[in-house]
Amino acid sequence: MAWDLESIKALADTQEGWSIEVEEHCLSISNDEGVDVFVYPGEQQLIAESLLFPLASVKDVDGLNALVLRTHQLLPLTTIGIKQIAGEDYYIAFGALSSDSKDTVVVEEIDTLFANVGEFLELYAEFLTHEEV
């Protein structure tokens, strides 16, 4: 099954504790802890991503980037990237999976991203200005 916004929303609606909003090209899914995951369907893959913090809030970008490269593989199914949004760079956590993935795999990806966001924020907190922690 190739996923689209409608089919992902139908699946997300079955998950307890998830709040779903349809946006122009993605779904915004929030859990009961206030973590937001944005899911983008494409022809070949689904991307699930969550904003971590703005690059401008990082005290030591080189140090953080070195730590990210050494540690992001410690948490399953999720990696770290930098994405520009409205002219500002943000660190994001994301996962990618095949657009032919089974529904259980899609749910696992989103659930894992929800869990990993908090872990990444804790792991990288020493590199952030106080107001971002």
Model-derived features: positions:
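Charge-rich, low-complexity N-terminal segments
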Residues: M1-F38, Q73-I85
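Short, internal acidic amphipathic alpha-helical interface segments
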Residues: E49-D89
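Hydrophobic residues embedded in beta-strands of well-ordered beta-sheets
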Residues: C26-L27, L46, D89-Y91
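Long, highly charged amphipathic alpha-helices
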Residues: S7, G63-A66, E108-E119
